[in-house]
Curated annotation (Swiss-Prot):
Ubiquitous low levels. GO terms for cellular component: apoplast; cytosol; nucleus; peroxisome; plant-type vacuole; proteasome complex; proteasome core complex, alpha-subunit complex; vacuole. Induction: Induced by the endoparasitic nematode M.incognita. Levels increase after infection in both giants cells and endodermal cells of galls. Later confined to giant cells at high levels. Disruption phenotype: Lethal due to defect in male gametogenesis. This is Proteasome subunit alpha type-3. Keywords: Acetylation, Cytoplasm, Isopeptide bond, Nucleus, Proteasome, Ubl conjugation. It comes from the Eukaryota. Gene3D superfamilies: Glutamine Phosphoribosylpyrophosphate, subunit 1, domain 1 (3.60.20.10). It comes from Arabidopsis thaliana. There is a cross-link at K221 (Glycyl lysine isopeptide (Lys-Gly) (interchain with G-Cter in ubiquitin)). The keyword GTP-binding does not apply. It is found in: Cytoplasm; Nucleus.
Amino acid sequence: MSSIGTGYDLSVTTFSPDGRVFQIEYAAKAVDNSGTVVGIKCKDGIVMGVEKLIASKMMLPGSNRRIHSVHRHAGMAVAGLAADGRQIVARAKSEARSYESVYGDAVPVKELSERVASYVHLCTLYWWLRPFGCGVILGGYDRDGPQLYMIEPSGISYRYFGAAIGKGKQAAKTEIEKLNLSEMTCKEGVIEVAKIIYKLHDEAKDKAFELEMSWICEESKREHQKVPDDLLEEAKTAAKTALEEMDAD
């Protein structure tokens, strides 16, 4: 890619002759090298899961979180550079607080997504800035029900039934398309997301990983929370069993 973009990849404000902005493509590459992040919208809420690759065996479990609460009713899962992700999470929290202080009500998920996407896009407009090397999945529950958005390094934001980013995104999207999300509960969704992440993890090539999951549903009183430990362990067991059965076949 660098040889193709030589001369046109020095600034985020420079277009190549065929209309590409290489700095944004490089930022997207940082996302594609990250662990897989999956988000699905079930009939009663949102489930998000992250394949959090463990950089060192000396790291304590739970370190370097990839899923963050940005408001009582909204959470964000990050793929790509963790430090860049923290900046986007901080901005999302700030926007949620600002909206609530002005209007006296929780920020709608669509409004929050648009504000964060505008901030991400801002970093693609000026030569002294660089694009964020991360993508995020934003899930929330508001008066319109559960909603799921994905924001890319270019600053675009779309609403999804199911979304995936990271190195296994294409295979994850294929698996998500097989699910009947409109009839699936969040409890069932937790198990399905765990199965997808375990299935896509390549033990021969990838580092060990920790499964991080959260949800927003009736079970959590429509608040963004970590998936309870007992359900998370059940999901891990189901995922490993499904993987063993697949290998046996």
